[in-house]
């Protein structure tokens, strides 16, 4: 039983580390996108936003992906493009 608990704790620690890595990657990408958008002329910014929104609109999510997850992604992308990090 102790071995099972130790193994589960080890796996949990691994998952936590993976989660931290993913969070760091997302944060880095947010910073990069924000910096790029801020350094673009307004018309170039709008063109990028329109292209990203168009690409999102054309994507048909897999049926196994819950609608809530798809909507969460779309909302987050819109938020990032319209109101980049302060």
Swiss-Prot record:
Principal location class: cytoplasm
Pfam families (UniProt xref) = Anti-adapt_IraP
Localized where?
Answer: Cytoplasm
The organism's superkingdom is given as Bacteria
Q: Which GO terms describe its cellular component?
A: cytoplasm
Name the coiled-coil region(s). 1-36
Q: Which GO terms describe its biological process?
A: cellular response to starvation
Keywords, in A-Z order: Coiled coil, Cytoplasm, Stress response
Protein role: Inhibits RpoS proteolysis by regulating RssB activity, thereby increasing the stability of the sigma stress factor RpoS especially during phosphate starvation, but also in stationary phase and during nitrogen starvation. Its effect on RpoS stability is due to its interaction with RssB, which probably blocks the interaction of RssB with RpoS, and the consequent delivery of the RssB-RpoS complex to the ClpXP protein degradation pathway.
- Family to which the UniProt record says this protein belongs: Belongs to the IraP family.
On assembly, the entry states: Interacts with RssB.
HAMAP family tied to this protein: Anti_adapt_IraP
**Name of protein:** Anti-adapter protein IraP
What organism is this sequence from?
Answer: Escherichia coli (strain SE11)
Corresponding gene? iraP
């Amino acid at each position: 039983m102790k071995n099972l608990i130790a193994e589960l704790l080890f796996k949990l620690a691994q998952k936590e580390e993976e989660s931290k890595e993913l969070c760091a990657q997302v944060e880095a990408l947010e910073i990069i996108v924000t910096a790029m958008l801020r350094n673009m002329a307004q018309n170039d910014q709008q063109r990028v936003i329109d292209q990203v929104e168009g690409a999102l609109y054309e994507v048909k999510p897999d049926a196994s992906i819950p609608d809530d997850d798809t909507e969460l992604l779309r909302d987050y992308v819109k938020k990032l493009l319209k109101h980049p990090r302060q």
